[in-house]
Amino acid sequence: MEAKFAHIILFFLLAFSFETLMARKESDGPEVIKLLKEFESDSRCKGKQFWPELIGVPALYAKGIIEKENPSITNIPILLNGSPVTKDFRCDRVRLFVNILGDVVQIPRVT
């Protein structure tokens, strides 16, 4: 019984300390920000399109920031990182991909 409990504790400790390879940080370099700005200038949607500064923040806080900075965004689903999504593009949607702690792990963008 104690061994099972120890395995469960170990699993949760590892799960909470796991950071996905998809997570991007500003420390990844200016090339990431540069690519985002280039894509943003070609966009057909109005308002801010990317929020790289929201990496690592809680999803509900990020959702509030996105709604405040671009009122045309009306659909902000919160999804576990790696969840399957459709490939259609909508100017009113930003998907927030989160880890098991609920922190944003991918750059939120209009999709």
UniProtKB/Swiss-Prot annotation:
UniProt keyword Secreted present: yes
UniProt GO molecular function: serine-type endopeptidase inhibitor activity
GO biological process assignments: response to wounding
Keywords: Protease inhibitor, Secreted, Serine protease inhibitor, Signal
Chain positions listed as propeptide in the UniProt record: 24-36
Marked site positions, Reactive bond: K87, D88
Protein name: Wound-induced proteinase inhibitor 1
GO cellular component labels: extracellular region
Main location: secreted
SUPFAM superfamilies listed in its UniProt record: CI-2 family of serine protease inhibitors
Gene3D superfamilies: Trypsin Inhibitor V, subunit A
Family under the similarity heading: Belongs to the protease inhibitor I13 (potato type I serine protease inhibitor) family.
PROSITE patterns reported for this sequence: POTATO_INHIBITOR
Secreted keyword on record: yes
Signal sequence range: 1-23
Compartmental location: Secreted
InterPro entries tied to this protein: Prot_inh_pot1, Prot_inh_pot1_sf
